[in-house]
Amino acid sequence: MGKVIGIDLGTTNSCVAVMEGKEPKVIENAEGERTTPSIIAFANGEKLVGQSAKRQAVTNPSNTIYAVKRLIGRNFTDPMVKKDQDIVPYNIVKADNGDAWVEADSNKYSPSQISAFILQKMKETAENYLGEKVTQAVITVPAYFNDAQRQATKDAGKIAGLEVLRIINEPTAAALAYGFDKAASKTIAVYDLGGGTFDVSILEIGDGVFEVKSTNGDTFLGGEDFDTRILNHLIDVFKKESGIDLRNDPLALQRLKEAAEKAKKELSSAVTTDINLPYITADSTGPKHLNIKFTRAEFEKLVDDLIEKTVEPCITALKDAGLKASDIQEVVLVGGMTRMPKVQEAVKKFFGREPHKGVNPDEVVALGAAIQGGVLNKEVTDILLLDVTPLSLGIETLGGVFTRLIDRNTTIPTKKSQVFSTADDNQHAVTIRVFQGEREMAASNKLLGQFNLEGIPPAPRGVPQIEVTFDIDVNGIVHVSAKDKASGKEQKVTIQASGGLSDAEIEQMVKDAEQNAYEDKKRKELIEAKNAADSLVYSTEKSLTEYGDKLSSEDKGAAEEALSALKAVLESEDAALIKEKTERLTAASMKIGEAMYKAQSENQPAGENTANDDKVVDADFQDVAKK
C-alpha cells in the first residue's frame, strides 16, 4: 500500500499532509506555501488553480470561482444558495438535476468538479514532494455536513483521481493532531471557525482512543461572512462620501473583497488599519479613490452577531454530550477566524478557560487527516477513532411525520432497523422517503433521496410488515434497505442526494479531468519549448551579429537557415516541431561557439596565461603537527 495523503479541503484555503516516519508533515506547494487558496479561474481557455487564480481575480471576477464548498451538495432552491448568489461575482445556476452549479467561461461546473480541481492540485503537490504516484487520500469535511454534502465531497475525490479511503470530520481530525502524542485522558472541545463553516465537537481522548461524544455547527457561517460585513461597510461609507454605489461594479467589488480580507487579518494583531484603494471607480468629475481608516472596535461591532451565532451550537453540543462547560479540560481552536481576539474572548467567556493555542489553526486539520491515513495503511498503530453522525436520520411516515431511526450523535458505523406497514388496503408498493434533520415534520428536514419497494402481496392496511434498515458507514454516508417480510422482496440503495451526480456523470467528469490533466501537461510542454526556442533565437542572433564574420560561409549559412526555420515555427502549437527545430539550431550554433572561443583566444595578450617563474617565491613552512 502506497502513501495515503490527508487533505483539508477548505472553503478559503486547502492543505495537504502526509505521515513521515512517526510524524505528520504539511507539504508545501509549488509556490512554497503551506496552504493553497481554494480558488479556480478560467482565463483564455486556461484553468488556473490556487494562488495564480487568486492573483487575477480582480480583472476576471465572473470567471473566478471561490468558496464553492458552501454550495457542494446543495439544491439550487436552498436559501443559503440564494444568499450566496447575492454576494459572489460569478453565476450560480440551476443544473438539470436541480442542484446548484456554477458557470464560468460559458461552461457549467458542479461544485464537486470545482473541488476536484483543488484536490488535483493537492494531489500533484504531494506527488512532487514524495516522488511517487498518489492514489489514496483521507479528505476532511465539516462535522455538520449532511449526507449529500459528504457524498458530493467523495465524488470530488473520485473525479480528481483519488480513492477516498475515509471522509473524516474536521474537528475530529484536529483532535487527532492535538492528542496524537499525548497519553493523558482529557475531555476536550474543538471550536472550529473556518472560512465558510462552523463546527464544535466534544471528545474524550486518552490512550490512543478518540471518542466523539457530540457535534454541532452551522455549515454557512465562517470567514466569508466576516469579509462580507467589512465589504458592505466599505460600500456604505464610500456611497455616503461620494454618492456612488459600488455594488453593481464587479471589478470594484473584487478589489473590495480582497481589501476586506486583508483588513480582517491585520486587525487580529493591530487595533487599526488603513484601507486605500486608488481609482476604485470614476464619474463625470474624474477618478475616485477609497481611503478609510478602519478600527478593530468597528470590525467587532460589525460581526458581533456572527460570533454570537457560534454560542448556541456550543450549548447544544454540551447538552448532547451530557456535560457542562466546566467539565471541558481543554478548548482547541481551529480555523483561521479563531485568530480574531474577539472570537477568542467569546470562547474563553463561554467555556470559562483560556483556549489552547498550541496548534496551527490552518494546518491542524490536514495533519489529523494524514494521521488517519497512517492508521488506514498501518503506518500508525494504537489509534482508535470513534466518530458520530451529526444529524438524525429517518423516513417520512403517515401525515408527513419524520420518524427517526438513528438519532444524532450516534457513534458510527451503525445499523438500525424498524418495521412499518401500509397505509391503504391492497397497497402493492411503498415509497420510502429518507430525510436527515431535527424537525418533527419530514418536509422541514433535508430530503436525502427516495426509492420504491414494489410487489407487496395484497393485504388489508396495517398487515404487511416492511422492515426498513438504515446503515451508516465510517464516512457518515447512508445506505438504506426496505424488505417485505412476507414475500422476501428487498430493495437496497446507497442514498444519492435528491439531486447529486449520477455514476455516469462522475465517470464523464473523471475522463474530463484526465483529459484536462493531459492537455495541461501538453500546454506546459509547449510553453517550455517556446521559451527555450525564444531564448535560443535571441542568443543566436546576437552571436551571429558579433561573430558571423568569423564563420565560414557554409557554417554561417547553415546557422542562418536553422535560425529562420525555428523562427518560422515559434508561433506554432506543435511542441515536438519546435523542439526539433530548436535541436537543429542548437547543433548549427555550435560552430558559432567555436568561432567565439577562437576569437577570444586570439584577442588575449600573448603570454597572459604563461607562468612567470622569475616571480615565484619559495615559502618556508613548518609541520606544526610534529611540534
UniProtKB/Swiss-Prot annotation:
Q: Which InterPro entries match?
A: ATPase_NBD, Chaperone_DnaK, Heat_shock_70_CS, HSP70_C_sf, HSP70_peptide-bd_sf, Hsp_70_fam
Keyword terms: ATP-binding, Chaperone, Nucleotide-binding, Phosphoprotein, Stress response
Locations of Polar residues compositional bias?
Answer: 600-610
- Region annotation (Disordered) maps to 598-627
Q: Which residues carry this modification: Phosphothreonine?
A: 197
What does the induction field say?
By stress conditions e.g. heat shock.
The yes or no answer to whether the keyword Transport is present is no
- Please note every region of biased composition (Basic and acidic residues): 612-627
The molecular function terms of the Gene Ontology recorded here are: ATP binding; ATP-dependent protein folding chaperone; unfolded protein binding
**PANTHER family given in the database record:** HEAT SHOCK PROTEIN 70KDA
What is known about what this protein does? Acts as a chaperone.
Give the record's family classification.
Belongs to the heat shock protein 70 family.
Under what name is this protein listed? Chaperone protein DnaK
Q: What organism does the record attribute this protein to?
A: Rickettsia akari (strain Hartford)
Please name the taxonomic classification of the source.
Bacteria, Pseudomonadati, Pseudomonadota, Alphaproteobacteria, Rickettsiales
Q: Which gene encodes it?
A: dnaK
